[in-house]
Amino acid sequence: MARIAGIDLPRNKRIEIALTYIYGIGRTTAQKILAESGVSVDTRTDSLTEAEVAKIREFIDKNIKVEGDLRRDVSMNIKRLMDLGCYRGLRHRKGLPVRGQRTKTNARTRKGPARTVAGKKK
């Protein structure tokens, strides 16, 4: 089993798809990695040679920020916005949508489960 960036890649999948199991690598990035490493996108993970795995691992280590480093950068960017007190930071702090979406209806993913408010009695 190929282990790259601390992640065990699934054996029976094409390497292009298997690389997307690593946080920070999508389909396009996976294709670029394989092109630079000289590995076919149709190769299955279990049929990779150790040399090919080493090439892929080396390219990712040198050129792409993945997993823990990327997660740390994202959280530091959000923390920086909150410390600045800018609008986006305030929205992060309040747990509301950051990019201008409506909140009168919807926005349940950010706001959490609905809390019913008692209506006015007649």
From Swiss-Prot:
One of its GO terms (biological process) is translation. InterPro entries: Rbsml_uS13_C (IPR027437), Ribosomal_uS13 (IPR001892), Ribosomal_uS13-like_H2TH (IPR010979), Ribosomal_uS13_bac-type (IPR019980), Ribosomal_uS13_CS (IPR018269). One of its GO terms (molecular function) is tRNA binding. Pfam families: Ribosomal_S13. Residues 97-122 are annotated as: Disordered. It comes from the Bacteria. Keywords: Ribonucleoprotein, Ribosomal protein, RNA-binding, rRNA-binding, tRNA-binding. GO terms for cellular component: cytosol; small ribosomal subunit. Belongs to the universal ribosomal protein uS13 family. HAMAP family: Ribosomal_uS13 (MF_01315). Located at the top of the head of the 30S subunit, it contacts several helices of the 16S rRNA. In the 70S ribosome it contacts the 23S rRNA (bridge B1a) and protein L5 of the 50S subunit (bridge B1b), connecting the 2 subunits; these bridges are implicated in subunit movement. Contacts the tRNAs in the A and P-sites. Part of the 30S ribosomal subunit. Forms a loose heterodimer with protein S19. Forms two bridges to the 50S subunit in the 70S ribosome. This is Small ribosomal subunit protein uS13. It comes from Geobacter metallireducens (strain ATCC 53774 / DSM 7210 / GS-15). The lineage of its organism: Bacteria, Pseudomonadati, Thermodesulfobacteriota, Desulfuromonadia, Geobacterales.
